[in-house]
Amino acid sequence: MSITTLYYLLLKKENAHEDSIWCCGWSNIKPEKKKQVENEEINEISQDSNPEEEQSESYIITGGLDDIIKVWQLNNGKLEVKHQLEGHSLGVISVAISPDGKTLASSSQDSSLILWDIATGEKLKTMETGATDVWTLDFSPDGKNVISGSNAGKILIFSVESGKQEQTLDTRGKFTLSVAYSPDGKYIASGALDGIVKIFDVVQGKLVHTLEGHAKPIRSLCFSPDSQLLLTASDDGHMKLYDVVHANLAGTLSGHASWVLSIAFSPDGKRFVSGSSDRTVRVWDLDTMQCQHVFKEHNDQVWGVKFNSESNKIVSVSEDKSINIYDCPL
């Protein structure tokens, strides 16, 4: 029996928001390590402590056109709201989660960018974006910066600590719809309204590659966990894989019948997932570049997809206001 036959819809949450859900994330907060205790006897007791106390906290984050962000926990097969975050006055466009899983960044149609504590639901700070439209977000791998695309074709780099804009990378192009930071911290990639992809060297702050493989808007892009590949998704219905260092096209993936709105790699780097306006979620194998499975459980376009930290589950969100969680065994 093929492992793909074991893929199934684990949970569906209808009407999770009052309007379309545009973005999602999956946070994994690891427990704080206990300080080393000098007394050996006490140390032995701490080592024998209940392992359940050491388990990570897993949260699903969703942002909607209803201006609301929700932090969910999966308990006993049910999705339960832990926090409802209110601070944006218009629809939530993008959410990004810091590498340690503790901090959430959110952007909105109201041009605001807000940082939140995921575990407590507390608003940490509102970034100083000025009058610039902020769009898709990503964290730097060290968690010190948040990057955003903008309507002016620029990539904005904000300091998490100060809340201020530290740097701007000019793509000299159209509206920057999507941005991604490479996991090794060396590159930032952007996708534009005209289908052009730019790759910048972070240290030098300069453009190193321009990729012109798509003819329509790039709504999502992401780096592979080893930072060697860049995956792009476009309204032309295709996805493309590029070798980051040499900017060579490694492959074109087709299968969606309409716009590809969201893509994400699995943390183990073996698979990636795509969501489309054709209402499907597709799981792809990186080695073969073949589609492993197609989920057809949404009734409208799929705006967001993400893997969990174990790479064995996927969350998707849609215009149909629902959240789907799929079991995708390794």
Where are these regions (language model features)?
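WD40/WD-repeat beta-propeller blade N-cap
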Residues: 14-21, 85-92, 128-134, 170-176, ...
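Residue-level detector of Asp-centered blade-edge/turn motifs that repeat once per structural unit
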Residues: 28-33, 54-56, 99-100, 141-142, ...
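Conserved strand-to-loop turn within each blade of WD40 beta-propeller repeats
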Residues: 63-66, 107-110, 149-152, 191-194, ...
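WD40-repeat beta-propellers
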Residues: 69-73, 113-116, 155-158, 197-200, ...
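Short loop/turn segments that connect beta-strands within beta-propeller blades
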Residues: 74-77, 118-121, 160-163, 202-205, ...
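Blade-level signature of beta-propeller repeat domains, shared across WD40, Kelch, NHL, RCC1
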Residues: 303-330
